[in-house]
Every structure is written in structure tokens, then in C-alpha cells.
Amino acid sequence: MVGMNDGGGGGVVRVPGLADETNPTGTGGRAVEVDYVRCFHRHEPGENQCSSAVSKHIKAPVHLVWSLVRRFDQPQKYKPFVSRCIVQGGVGVGSLREVNIKSGLPATTSFERLEHLDDNEHILSIRIVGGDHRLKNYSSIITAHPETIDGRPGTLVIESFVVDVPDGNTKDETCYFVEALIKCNLKSLADISERLAVQDYTESIHH
């Protein structure tokens, strides 16, 4: 995982030191991640906001990973904390969804709007517009980038966010909490994508 933490101040997410134990491409790969963040993950955190980004290298081709990520109407396909999702109307920029959270978390419902969806560049952006949780003015961007891992097609996924810091919490505490949720989501995304990739590879051999 890569944590790229910005305590506020505007502009793109700052990337201090990168440490990614799952990075198969070494230092050069980390430089690429920094470039992707600067190009695609532009946030303007206010004085009482924090912004950060998390990355994950997945041993599955980008089209497969993206087929899960792009489903604004079905985040439960890979997000383990989502029990169900209801979309009002069709799926497109401006669409709203009601996301129900599984019991055990300090929230039950989140209302979210689709801000941007680009199937060519593999970019998805959402904004939380309501719900019984503490993630106020939360906005996120997730991108998927093709790469090669162990000689096979792989995907680098980066998810960044900006959010208000709740009363009684520090910027570091808020970023740590959100990063932990994103890491769980990306681990689940990797597990599911890699399992599907193995199935596809096995089927191609038998055919």
C-alpha cells in the first residue's frame, strides 16, 4: 500500500515518502505512482480537511479490474462493508445512490453522487452528499492503470480522497481511518480480480 498524505493547503495530494511492500516494479514504479497522482488525483483540501491516496498493485488485467470498479450501481461487488445499493434512475454523471452499510460500523446509510466516469482513462469519481456518518464533504477519485506484473497483465489502482476533519479528531486520525477503509476495499478488489483472472487464464488453456 502507498499512503500519500496531505494535511491541507490546496493543490494535488502531496506525496512525501512512498513505501509499498506490494510494489513489483521498485523505485521506478513508485515514481510512476507519483506521476499518476499528480495527473489524475487533483484535490483542493480546505483548512479543516485532509487528503490522501492509497495504491494497490493487482495481478489481473485492467479491463477485468475496471469492470468491477466502474459499477457505481453495485459497489458491493467488491466493497466488503456494503450490504446493498439502490440507484435512483439510470447510471450516469449526476446519478445518486443510497448505500447501506453492514452492521458493526458507525454508520448505516450513505448517499453518494457520481461525479465522473471515464471508461477510456479508467477514472471514477464520487461525492458523498448525505448519510448518518462523519464523512462530511467527502470526495474520492479512483483510477486504474495497466502495468505488467511477473510478465503478465496487471493493474495499478489508486484511490484518493478529501474529507472534512470531524470535531474532536485530528487530520492524521481522519486520514488513518479513511485509508484503512480504502485499504480493505482495495484488498477485496484485488482478491476478487485475481481470482477471476485465474479463472479466465485456466479457461483459455482448456479452450
Regions found by a protein language model. Give the residues of each.
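Short, highly charged C-terminal tails/helix-capping segments
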Residues: C39, K187-H207
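Short amphipathic alpha-helical segments embedded in low-complexity Lys/Glu-rich regions
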Residues: V82-I86, T174-C175, I205-H206
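Beta-strand/loop substructures that line and gate deep hydrophobic ligand-binding cavities in soluble
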Residues: G3, S125-C184
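Well-ordered beta-strand positions in beta-sheet-rich domains
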Residues: A53-H57, T108-F111, S139-T143, I158-S160
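Amphipathic alpha-helical protein-protein interaction segments
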Residues: E47, S51, I58, S103, ...
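Amphipathic alpha-helical interface elements that mediate macromolecular binding in regulatory proteins
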Residues: H63, S67, D73, E112, ...
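Hydrophobic ligand-binding cavity/cleft-lining segments
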Residues: V2-G92
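Glycine-rich portal/gate segments that line the openings of hydrophobic small-molecule binding cavities
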Residues: H57, H63, R70-K136, L196
